[in-house]
């Protein structure tokens, strides 16, 4: 299984604005998880400065971002999708052992 990271840069006022959007964002995230395309996701930092969402498919990651109210309402200021070459761990896409 391939891995792709959806990387979000969050607006400085993210915490103040996310409340009104969080339910719709989480509904979208859990729908993607239930569909099997989203593995994990969450904010990074305390306070949050970015977010990472791990997907099994790059097209699904892009589609998620394009629909995400955090993106459409501007509390995500930049996003991109990058392949993640996972090599260690039980769910590594390409396990490499010494």
Where are the language model's segments positioned?
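Conserved, structured core segments of small domains
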Residues: 1-98
């Amino acid at each position: 299984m391939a891995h792709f990271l959806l990387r979000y840069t969050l607006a400085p006022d993210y915490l103040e604005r996310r409340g009104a959007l969080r339910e719709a964002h989480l509904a979208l995230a859990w729908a993607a998880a239930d569909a099997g395309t989203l593995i994990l996701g969450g904010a990074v930092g305390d306070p949050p400065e970015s977010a990472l969402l791990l997907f099994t498919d790059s097209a699904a990651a892009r589609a998620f971002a394009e629909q995400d109210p955090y993106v459409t309402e501007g509390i995500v200021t930049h996003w991109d999708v990058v392949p993640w070459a996972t090599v260690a761990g039980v769910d590594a896409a390409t396990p490499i052992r010494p």
